[in-house]
Amino acid sequence: MWNKPSDSERIDAVTAWLDAADIAYDLYFHPASPTIELAKRHWRDDGSKHCKNLFFRNHKGNRHYLVCFDCDRTLSIHDLEARLHQGKLSFASPERMMRYLGLEPGSVSPFGLINDAEHHVHLFLDRNLLYC
């Protein structure tokens, strides 16, 4: 069973990864937000681009996908299924999210992939994020 990392362990893992990659960053904190509408209440107006991050599983439950796209866009799961050619998708459970990403609903981020030591989760980025 996966042990839930503490908030400080999560922060330390991300900052250590960014430091090792020599990526400059500033930390901003806000509560976990299950919707973009709630998250927007905490975002700074600094020109940053924000994403929706959704965690899916395939119909067999043996493949998992983190999908990141512009927060101002909508996503049709059926369109995503057709584009990714991965079969029927559904949202992964909180237990799967914790097991593979070390995260809870409302806090999904690509940084959760740091916790995926076995590289089980497939990451898909919306091409529109290239222009951020």
Predicted regions span which residues?
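Extended, low-hydrophobicity, polar/charged segments
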Residues: M1-C132
